[in-house]
Amino acid sequence: MSLRVLNSVTPSLRGTVLVDKTALWKGRPEKSLVSSRVSSGGRNSRGVITVRHRGGGHRRLYRVVDFKRNKEGVPAVVKRLEYDPNRTAFLALIQYEDGELSYILAPSGLKVDDVIMSGAGSDVLPGNCLKLSMIPSGTFVHNVEMKVGGGGIIARAAGSYAQVMGRDGAYVMLRLGSGEVRRILSVCRATVGVVSNLDNRNIKLGKAGRSRWLGLRPKVRGVAMNPVDHPHGGGEGKTSGGRNSVTPWGVPTKGKKTRKRGKHSDKYIRVSSVKR
């Protein structure tokens, strides 16, 4: 996929850069693989805002994506590539030899009519799913499991990937996008390739309305608020905030370490992404 720079016919289109989706499916999603989705608007079960700057947006249907890829030894043909409003990556609709349909995350370079497969007999090609022990060092992978059979968790966003670094006994060393090197059980599955829509990081929405279509609400600066609403608020005239940047709850930002010390999973992290 490439980028599409819009002509400045109107002020809102000036500087707008979007991903070109002309090669994607233009019809409705597969009816058997969608379910209804109720937007939370950033609220919890009590109606309290737990995530700010969310709300509104276009109505969406949730596409049921197969993150486990546990149908081994059965080839599947890519029927079409689709846009998914619920994530930044594109989806691929695949059909197995027995007729079953499924959505998977589309890796970069996957095309319609390509044949993919999961399991021990699969080649190391984009879209094929194998155990980490069967993937050679240096290979880029995505949709990596952290628990055996639990489904892929690591590297699922557009353009993301992890790199197989080597073996460490029953584990495989993975370098994540953050620079962290982590040990994962070698029997966990991963899909070969980089997630599609690599140009997602380069888009420019161009206007506030396009953010609202995506369900994103305005982000008000703390220095523009009143003292009751934010530690940076208040003051006579325009101020700098008077202190180092903090969240509305007073927690320092811009470098503050948020991971708890002594977590059980620390033993699986060989190189941290945070420089101490």
Swiss-Prot record:
UniProt cross-references to SMART domains, sorted A to Z: Ribosomal_L2, Ribosomal_L2_C
Record flagged with keyword Chloroplast: no
InterPro entries: NA-bd_OB-fold, Rib_uL2_dom2, Ribosomal_uL2, Ribosomal_uL2_bac/org-type, Ribosomal_uL2_C, Ribosomal_uL2_CS, Ribosomal_uL2_dom3, Ribosomal_uL2_RNA-bd_dom
GO cellular component: large ribosomal subunit
Keyword Membrane annotated: no
Family of the protein in this entry: Belongs to the universal ribosomal protein uL2 family.
Name of the protein: Large ribosomal subunit protein uL2
Gene: rplB
Stretches with biased composition (Basic residues): 254-264
SUPFAM superfamilies attached to this UniProt entry: Nucleic acid-binding proteins, Translation proteins SH3-like domain
Gene3D superfamilies in the record: 2.30.30.30, Nucleic acid-binding proteins, Ribosomal protein L2, domain 3
Stated role: One of the primary rRNA binding proteins. Required for association of the 30S and 50S subunits to form the 70S ribosome, for tRNA binding and peptide bond formation. It has been suggested to have peptidyltransferase activity; this is somewhat controversial. Makes several contacts with the 16S rRNA in the 70S ribosome.
